[in-house]
Amino acid sequence: MPQRSALTRSVHYGWYVVAAGTLCVFAGLGFGRFALGMLLPAMGASLELTYSQMGLISTSNFVGYLLAVLVCGYLSSRIGSRLLIFLALLLVAVSMLMVSQAQSFMTVAFFYTLTGMGSGASNVPMMALVASWFSTGQRGKAAGFIVIGSGFAILLSGKLIPYLNQLREFDGWRISWLVLGIIVLIISVICFMVIRDSPGELGLKPFAGMGSSRKDGHFPFDDGQKSVTRKDIYHLGAIYFLFGCTYVIYATFIVTTLVQERGFSEMVAGNFWSWVGFLSLFSGPVFGTLSDKLGRKTGLIIVFSIQMCAYLLVALSLPGMFLYLSIGFYGIVAWSIPSIMAALVGDYVGPQKTARVFGFITFIFALGQIAGPAVAGFLAEKSGSFSSSFYMAAMFAGLAVVLSFLLKKPAQVS
């Protein structure tokens, strides 16, 4: 017991929860969703998929995600976030193993829907735990470190999947799904061993920063604003919807665009995607911390402006050097919005209501994720190019800038 007390004084246990959260996002979202972009070209060729079917496979994942976030708040309150996260990651692992054996579009879509359910049921409670383990002035940074798990997954998948795919000429992608599923299975056990539902279980208080004189953090609205209205929550949901609709178009179709429209090999396109993963490692911590310092609204405006530029640079079919710039813009802010939104919800409603409210706006976010790839695939099929899809993403990102500008600070919400 004395040894544990000494350890928690030097490193607050909340940071161990953050580390487990990084692994959770790495497995549930990083492999469960973002690896798809690297796998689609090979799967499309092997299973003879159309652009629309590729888009619908991605959409099936988001349908599952949508269904999961509807019940996350209820399940979390009944069985606890720790057990829910473990079971959700277990579902991700098993469904990915089943995708590796799929022989048709419908089979892939069915099991990838289950993957989406596991992704949603692990991600929402994990992000909501930030409000329980950290006070307001630390939430952006803590959430930022959790969301970079997706970046690590993209970085690894961009290198690993092309290697695994070439092990078998026509269906190496099956090996990729198998390996990824096994990794997720291992991570589910690690998360169950490390995560705790609240600092109170260990006799601790939420982390407020080194040397903080306030036990509840250094903002007066750490317990949430009772004056927050339903309109304010819908406002947050609208912003999160636009993020869901736009970022997923890029994540799903950029590799396919590079391979099928720009003539890049799968290996070179994988290197591009790995750069997204590497750069995204900085996105959550940098912009999450920036939102702690400059305000959530300023952080959102900066991030959406950069994303709009990333989408336009692909849509305009400019020379190759601009693709590098687009990759750079997308990567450096890739996971910033979820970290800022998780912190912002905690600022608005406090730790006790964060899981429920974050689950609600994540439901709206998931609607955007369903609409985005489906519409993008349809536009690409009709126009013969993904340029129209990226133009749409840029327009929606611009709208998100405007909505972010109109956000009220938590203390000003009435």
Residue ranges of predicted features:
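Glycine-rich segments within core transmembrane alpha-helices of 12-TM secondary carriers
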Residues: 140-159, 362-372
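C-terminal ends and interior cores of transmembrane alpha-helices
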Residues: 90-103, 306-318
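C-terminal transmembrane helical hairpin of 12-TM major facilitator-type secondary transporters
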Residues: 274-284, 289-344
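Paired small-residue
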Residues: 95, 106-114, 321-329
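Extracytoplasmic gate region of multi-pass secondary transporters
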Residues: 36-40, 229-284
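Helix-loop-helix hairpin linking two adjacent transmembrane segments in secondary transporters
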Residues: 145-200
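Cytoplasmic helix-loop-helix junction between adjacent transmembrane helices
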Residues: 111-148
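Helix-breaking motifs and short loop linkers at transmembrane-helix boundaries and internal kinks
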Residues: 48, 80, 101-106, 263, ...
